[in-house]
């Protein structure tokens, strides 16, 4: 029964990450179609970057503490990428450069979204597997 709770908690962490990344993509799309000015778009995106990094870090530590080594190893590249961006001070969107880097910023977030959705599908699979395994016992 404990594994189901572990997968359920990680499911909600991943849903939060998907929501944050989709919010960033919507802000970039609004900027692309001129619904929002660059300053507002950059401030909205920058306000959720650190929570995204924190949620991802907590999720990776959560997998480590619960003994799910495969999922921990699967989360490490994304965590390393976030740490690399943060240490080089490239994690925030610059207001003056946002139009020049718009396609790159969208592409980065689409790759992040695909990576998180893959983790989400694996989490759903293991949650269902754990529920069926507990049902058989």
From Swiss-Prot:
The keyword Transmembrane applies. The keyword Transmembrane helix applies. Pfam families: Cornichon (PF03311). The chain crosses the membrane at residues 8-28, 53-73, 113-133. It is found in: Membrane. One of its GO terms (biological process) is vesicle-mediated transport. It comes from the Eukaryota. InterPro entries: Cornichon. It is a multi-pass membrane protein. Keywords: Membrane, Transmembrane, Transmembrane helix. GO terms for cellular component: membrane. Belongs to the cornichon family. This is Protein cornichon homolog 4. It comes from Arabidopsis thaliana. The lineage of its organism: Eukaryota, Viridiplantae, Streptophyta, Embryophyta, Tracheophyta.
